[in-house]
Design a protein with these regions (language model features):
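Canonical helix-turn-helix DNA-binding module
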Residues: 42-77
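Basic, amphipathic "hinge/linker" alpha-helix immediately C-terminal to the N-terminal HTH DNA-binding motif
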Residues: 75-94
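N-terminal positioning helix adjacent to the helix-turn-helix/winged-helix DNA-binding module
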Residues: 22-25, 41, 82, 93, ...
């Protein structure tokens, strides 16, 4: 079967979605590492994601081009203002999904693992509903 533009469209979207997930995961990780250790180095990201130094470097370079991270050779990695905003949104979205999973009886370990994947694929509408249900459960439990 010959490849046409319409055949490759789903694959292009999948690659774009994976690229976005990676960006979100990396800015969230940089924020977490900076909070925990006061600075983030390339080796910290490679260790955090269990990837090679080369892979982490390639992703950091891409995120620099996208204006999410800034760094210089042998210097710590920092979040730009744009990167900080994305990290905050990602952390909030992650926490809502995690709390929702806990509220429906999922154990903490499974909820933490599942939230990592779900957070990237939940629509804003669904996320709002998750948040409403979590808040309703919290107010009922108080």
């Amino acid at each position: 079967m010959a490849r046409t533009a319409s055949n490759s469209t789903p694959h292009q979207r999948t690659r774009r979605d994976h690229s976005t997930e990676t960006a979100e995961d990396y800015v969230e990780a940089v924020a977490d590492i900076i909070t925990e250790r006061t600075s983030c180095r390339l080796v910290d990201l490679a260790e955090y994601f269990a990837v090679s130094h080369v892979t982490a470097n390639r992703i950091v370079a891409r995120l620099q081009k996208e204006g999410l991270l800034s760094t210089e050779p042998y210097q710590p990695i920092e979040l730009t203002a744009k990167g900080k905003r994305l990290a905050v949104r990602c952390r909030q979205r992650h926490e809502i999904v995690y709390q929702f999973l806990l509220s429906i009886g999922i154990d903490e370990q499974t909820a933490a693992i599942d939230a990592e994947g779900i957070e990237h694929h939940v629509s804003p509408k669904t996320l709002r509903r998750f948040e409403e249900l979590v808040q309703r459960n919290e107010s009922r439990d108080s």
